[in-house]
Structures are given as C-alpha cells and as structure tokens.
A protein has these predicted regions:
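ATP/Mg2+-dependent ligation/transfer catalytic cores
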Residues: 1-205
Length: 207
C-alpha cells in the first residue's frame, strides 16, 4: 500500500488503500459489509444553502446496490424555490468519492454527498455544483486561467471569561494555550473534518 494513503486520516482511504477519487461502488459495498455499517445517508445542498439528508437502513445487499446505483427520487419543489410542483421530480445520486464515516452518528453510518439529476437522467443545470462548474468554465474562457479556491472556517466560542491567563483582544493571532482558549475544541473539529475527507492546511487561533 502507498504509505501516504496508509497514513491518511480519512478512514475509508486508509482502509481501502486508494485515494477517494478512485472509490467505486464495489469499494463502498465492501467497506459497509466489512465494517458493520448499518445506515447510509445521502446529503445534498438545497436552495436555502442548508445540507439536506436522506437516511437509509441497509435491509439487504440488493437494496444497498439499488440505492447506490439508482439514487433516490426527491421533490425538487420543496428543495428549490424556482422549481414548480408540476415538474419537481429530481433524483439524487451519491458521489462515491465523498463517502465518509459519520463521526456523530450513534448508529454506524456511512454518508455521501449527492448530485442532482432531472427526470430524464441529465445533471440538473441549476444545481449548486453545476452553477459553480459553469462559472469556472466561463472564468477560464474569458481569462485563460483556472479557478482554484480554498475554504476558511471561522467561528466564535461564547463562554465565561477565564480568570487565569485572560485573552487579550486583538492579540490572539496564532496564540497558544493557556492564553488561547478551547484549543482542544479546534483540534477535535480538525480531526473530524480530516476523517471525513477534508484536506486541511492548518488551524490556528484568531485575533
């Protein structure tokens, strides 16, 4: 096995011995069978910007194969305000490369992000991912450059003021404990994100 893959915090990558982009349906089925996974979640963003979820209990091998192959029908008019009820049939199909073991589920659960397709089996042109793809292509056509981006997660932790080693406003950039608070919370979040397949450059305290 590639040692880089063996050391991956992504549990599926480490177990299957291949990068997530190479995951196949057979890989997903194998991981589910060999790791006692009891549920599968399909997750997909809607027009309100929130992530929606469909939960599947794994009844048998045939059922698992069916949902991984065909996805599931959803009501597009309840997900996007611009889709009318009369033409609202959409399908969500899992992207195997996004599979991750849900760290918060009490029942062993494998989750995957999904893509939208219309009733004729074509990708939904107005879906968030295809809107971004079209914007990237337009950017490339106009500038000749490739659009690349990284996300940055920032948050506040609201808690009573610490009496010992109080933090100083506008002086917390890259600060360490005990002056920076809740470092364990940040590192635990980073570990969960990495286990789910997120590629993290670094984490640090802010000002």
């Amino acid at each position: 096995m590639n040692r880089d893959l063996e050391m991956s915090p992504n549990r599926l990558v480490a177990y299957l011995g291949k990068p997530c982009k190479a995951f196949t349906k057979a890989d997903i089925v194998r991981y589910i069978k060999e790791n006692g996974i009891q549920m599968v979640n399909f997750m997909y963003p809607a027009g309100d910007g929130r992530l929606k979820t469909l939960n599947f209990v794994i009844n048998n091998a045939a059922y698992l194969d069916a949902i991984l192959t065909c996805g599931e029908r959803v009501d597009g008019s309840s997900l996007f305000p611009f889709i009318e009820a009369g033409s609202s049939d959409l399908y969500v199909l899992p992207r195997f490369s996004t599979a991750f073991l849900d760290p918060f589920a009490e029942i062993p659960t494998l989750s995957m992000l999904c893509s939208y397709f219309n009733k004729d089996g074509f990708p939904l042109e107005s879906s968030p991912e295809n809107t971004l793809r079209k914007a990237c292509r337009a950017f490339n056509d106009v500038t000749g450059m490739e659009f690349q981006a990284m996300g940055e997660l920032e948050y506040y932790v609201i808690a009573p003021d610490a009496e010992l080693f109080p933090a100083t406003d506008q002086k917390g950039y890259h600060e360490s404990a005990p002056y920076a608070k809740f470092n364990e919370f940040r590192t635990q979040c980073m570990a969960y994100i990495a286990q789910a397949g997120g590629e993290i450059k670094y984490g640090h305290s802010e000002v």
